[in-house]
């Protein structure tokens, strides 16, 4: 179907061939099959819930997020895959072009936003502000998948602690799987 092909192309997946039917449930991966089957219903998207995948580099977070994203596209959901460093660069570029608010609104409209390489390094003030605005516009309305090498416990420090970190994490965690 042309529409689904376009949805998948427009999502800019790292791996557009990833498929939920091909998920490897090897016990070493510690994937909960029933939870993955629940995610495959796309109910989390309908409810505006987030997903957080945490694990070491190379363990399959990106592939898994892309499999869920491709599945969402097949169900006519709009999806965007982007790495956090790339997202921060885009925010800066749009700010310079005077199109920041327009870009933020567009990001707020995707049914599913997949943010890979989430918080690989500490953030600066501008990045934290951008992240807060993005989470505010999506919170409880649209779903976001976060792929990170660091567990949630380390995120607060990578966001420089304090009230902005609290606000960002509150919007992510309180509506997450």
Write out the residue ranges for each language-model feature.
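Non-DNA-binding regulatory cores of transcription-related proteins
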Residues: 42-43, 141
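N-terminal pre-Walker A segment at the start of P-loop NTPase domains
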Residues: 18-42
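Interdomain "pre-motor" coupling segment immediately N-terminal to P-loop NTPase/helicase cores
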Residues: 1-16
């Amino acid at each position: 179907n042309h529409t689904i092909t376009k949805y998948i192309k427009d999502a800019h997946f790292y791996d557009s061939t990833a498929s939920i039917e091909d998920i490897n449930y090897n016990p070493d991966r510690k994937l909960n099959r029933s939870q993955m089957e629940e995610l495959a219903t796309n109910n989390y998207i309908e409810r505006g819930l987030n997903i957080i995948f945490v694990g070491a580099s190379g363990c399959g977070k990106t592939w898994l997020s892309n499999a869920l994203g491709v599945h969402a596209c097949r169900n006519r959901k709009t999806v965007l895959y982007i790495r956090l460093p790339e997202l921060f660069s885009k925010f800066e570029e749009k700010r310079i072009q005077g199109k920041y608010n327009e870009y933020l609104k567009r990001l707020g409209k995707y049914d599913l936003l997949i943010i890979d390489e989430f918080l690989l390094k500490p953030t600066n003030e501008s990045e934290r502000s951008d992240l807060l605005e993005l989470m505010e516009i999506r919170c409880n309305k649209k779903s976001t998948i976060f792929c990170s090498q660091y567990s949630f416990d380390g995120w607060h420090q990578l966001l420089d602690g304090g009230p902005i970190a609290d606000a960002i994490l509150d919007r992510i965690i309180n509506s997450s799987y």
